[in-house]
């Protein structure tokens, strides 16, 4: 029991929580540096050649679970430990502080007033019930009052004591939601060509929705670099009597019935070419060896003496580069332009078909994340509210009225309010 109390005392300290948060933040940063969820052999091949920090090879990456940090045993343990730390801090510090604040403190002796941060007193000349008048004045200004025969206690801003507790609850929900999302979320990357559709099936409700790419276009900078990718998607379901078009672009996902659809990438997936009066739809593939965002394929051209040519394209408007892989000569074919002759074959580019790269993610932890951030924001705002207290005591022997005040924050602002209230009570 003693060991358990020492353990709770240790983990409920602010220093321990801060160190744990720093550890989790650094671990999350490492997770963005090291690709997550790839095949283990990829880590072994890559990090054996280029070890992390010069000494952590591929086998050690896997052994330390750095290939799946967010679902690793040690990362989840640190999240659980932080939840326990926050809960322990709430029960050891915040809740007792709230309970203490809910209890009225009664100052019967004027000597106690001199221990307060703010104090004033003055002699009563006229015969009047100043306690009753002070009670009425403070109630009108929104103070809560506990009144006795010759004294009263007043307080305002008690909701500020709830702020830290609400923040801790929000953080705990955030940690639990994040861990839940790491295990339960599903993600799929899908490229859709214009007019191509995809079925989305919700197994829990046995509902099916078809999405179809109606339009896709790229906004470019003045120098031709991509600025924004935009997809218009049609959502259709006879079962749900649904037919509507939604738009997604980078950093503006579509949220639909628990799914989130992100605009992630694009590609040139197909081209339609006429070669010697015959139409061909050719599928292109990325060629990272040549450069980023370059797609192409290898074909044979020529009626008798056939030669291999590499077709490449780097944007949705063309032109198409035709390269002879033997002598490296190049020709360009422009969209809907006159055909050109290469090795006795006539080529013309009829259509360029881009694809929209979408990431479709099902993350049931999203409601927990939104709830947690709402609680954290509300709790933070409440924490900014100062808790102010005022005590008033009338000494019948000396015929003096004592007024004292205390505030847990913004003492300078409360001092101005305190002096103003004191003058109003004196002149009331």
Curated annotation (Swiss-Prot):
Q: Where in the cell is it found?
A: Cellular thylakoid membrane
User: Which GO CC terms are listed, alphabetically?
Assistant: plasma membrane-derived thylakoid membrane
What organism does the record attribute this protein to?
Prochlorococcus marinus subsp. pastoris (strain CCMP1986 / NIES-2087 / MED4)
Give me the segments passing through the membrane: 14-34, 72-92, 162-182
The record describes the protein's role as:
Required during biogenesis of c-type cytochromes (cytochrome c6 and cytochrome f) at the step of heme attachment.
The yes or no answer to whether the keyword Thylakoid is present is yes
Domain of life according to the entry: Bacteria
Sorted alphabetically, which keywords does the UniProt record give?
Cytochrome c-type biogenesis, Membrane, Thylakoid, Transmembrane, Transmembrane helix
Membrane topology annotation: Multi-pass membrane protein
Query: What's the name of the protein?
Result: Cytochrome c biogenesis protein CcsB
How it assembles, according to the record, is:
May interact with CcsA.
Q: Which family does it belong to?
A: Belongs to the Ccs1/CcsB family.
Which gene is this protein's source? ccsB
Which GO BP annotation is one of this protein's?
cytochrome complex assembly
